[in-house]
Amino acid sequence: MSKAKEGDYGSIKKVSGPVVVADNMGGSAMYELVRVGTGELIGEIIRLEGDTATIQVYEETSGLTVGDGVLRTKQPLSVDLGPGILGNIFDGIQRPLKAIADVSGDVFIPRGVNVPSLDQTKQWEFRPSAFKVGDRVTGGDIIGIVPENSLLDHKVMLLPQAKGTVTYIAAPGNYTINEKIIEVEFQGAKYEYSMKQSWPVRSPRPVVEKLLADTPLLTGQRVLDSLFPGVRGGTCAIPGAFGCGKTVISQALSKYSNSDGIVYVGCGERGNEMAEVLMDFPQLTMTMPDGREESIMKRTTLVANTSNMPVAAREASIYTGITLSEYFRDMGYNFAMMADSTSRWAEALREISGRLAEMPADSGYPAYLGARLASFYERSGRVACIGSPEREGSVTIVGAVSPPGGDFSDPVTSATLGIVQVFWGLDKKLAQRKHFPSVNWLISYSKYLNALEPFYEKFDSDFVTLRQVAREVLQKEDELNEIVQLVGKDALAESDKIILETARFLKEDYLQQNSFTKYDKYCPFYKSVGMMRNIVTFHRLATQAIERTAAGNVDGQKITFNIIKAKLGDLLYKVSSQKFEDPSDGEGVVTAHLNELNEELKEKFRALEDEYR
């Protein structure tokens, strides 16, 4: 504060929880960063009237008094972007928690702590690209590469608004993130740039254009990959009551999805859930194409903003997370962002809105809730990035929603469903039956099915038909359940009994998945397709056998469901045991086993029909 001039100060007029009103703030800008009080607490201007500014403070405001100074920084709330983001854990306004713990030695973050977001002293190996002195460069051009870790190369880009002629570019070597690595001249003025760049969190980073997303986001969860697929660059919502497994699905996506990297934002959730992520992730490994094992933490950034941290910072944490994701997208990577949970973010908006005495709308949420949610989800997408070389990247947003009491008519859930394209609805009843992932296949949907058809045709031309049959079986089973409860299973037609058996295979052995086993924690797409093919083949052959013998047999020798169960019991057991195929045996082995079972199904049913002909 020593360098600040007197004109840069305002004074506190009123304090109301995390909201502070200050006088003498003429010339301030909306969303400008300020330092409040003697403790220099971080705050952001959210409303201006005359020379009075309303500020939301991102730290505990107890102890502030009327008349305390408010220092303007003349810059918006920004995040630092550069090498050192991956594997790190930040709070909602990008303060590194590990560095703060080392500095303060405290369990909780002390107020007013001022620690740089990225390590200023660490030397990074810089390898310049093909640019040389005299070349013209524009914003987004990749000027060099820093091998951040063994998983990802960090591509150092020129700031989006920078351009000019190169007058200096650093030689290959080790540099800190603040050292000059390139100097450009534009209209007679020279500008220096380092590996680090700042970007305001509320402004989306510029792109050339948005592209159509056509590659699925494979999660390793059969129910999601086969029935309700997301895409890389899409938006997904996971609403569900407490204990339905939202966090487990979010963490499974972080661990096993086919993204290049993950930004996991724990926004207002319980502190022990973030602690669990911090304990689990460093121990988890992923197998690379060349067979080596790498820690998942190397491709993950955590933004922790737990429920006992100040409310206002929850709002910032979502923007911090999406800005970090966009930065990696601009390098040409496919990043996924998990927001767990957007309901807590909306509650923070509601609290701030209440403090500002704004007119409340549904359930006390502000009227602009839908617009805020939309502006956040709209920052996802597959894009053509600015700068050279030409490249494409994507940001996928998966938002968990926690409606109170599992009520999907809650304003946050309703507003979210109007925006997102994929809805994975979690069901309390399924969770109570210990059916996980507890995605309800009757209410969930994905609007990306048509966009993904070319991919499925290329992968396996039968898959679209298989999925259609599986969904029809599940739908019919739901209708038959009412009849079964009234008159019992035995009163059903034989073909309906087959539908119930197929649905049982689908529900218990396909859609249900055990995240804590070696063979089932992650299911590759080829295994999902092979398993579904065998279940649908059983359904088709069994129905066909019953119908054929029923139509053409006069002697009363008909194949019934009980006969199929008695004669082919071991085959049915094999169909339900497909999930025990271990993907670590390799694609060739698993596919061969599943194909053998398919042939065996056809052979045994043919023999059964011959016997009863």
UniProtKB/Swiss-Prot annotation:
Keywords: ATP-binding, Hydrogen ion transport, Ion transport, Nucleotide-binding, Translocase, Transport. One of its GO terms (cellular component) is proton-transporting V-type ATPase, V1 domain. The keyword Transport applies. PROSITE patterns: ATPASE_ALPHA_BETA (PS00152). One of its GO terms (biological process) is ATP metabolic process. ATP binds at G240, A241, F242, G243, C244, G245, K246, T247. It catalyses: ATP + H2O + 4 H(+)(in) = ADP + phosphate + 5 H(+)(out). Gene3D superfamilies: 2.40.30.20, 2.40.50.100, Bovine Mitochondrial F1-atpase, Atp Synthase Beta Chain, Chain D, domain 3 (1.10.1140.10), P-loop containing nucleotide triphosphate hydrolases (3.40.50.300). Its EC number is 7.1.2.2. One of its GO terms (molecular function) is proton-transporting ATPase activity, rotational mechanism. Coiled coil: none annotated. Catalytic subunit of the peripheral V1 complex of vacuolar ATPase. V-ATPase vacuolar ATPase is responsible for acidifying a variety of intracellular compartments in eukaryotic cells. NCBIfam families: PRK04192.1, V-ATPase_V1_A. Belongs to the ATPase alpha/beta chains family. V-ATPase is a heteromultimeric enzyme composed of a peripheral catalytic V1 complex (main components: subunits A, B, C, D, E, and F) attached to an integral membrane V0 proton pore complex (main component: the proteolipid protein). HAMAP family: ATP_synth_A_arch. This is V-type proton ATPase catalytic subunit A isoform 1. It comes from Acetabularia acetabulum. The lineage of its organism: Eukaryota, Viridiplantae, Chlorophyta, Ulvophyceae, TCBD clade.
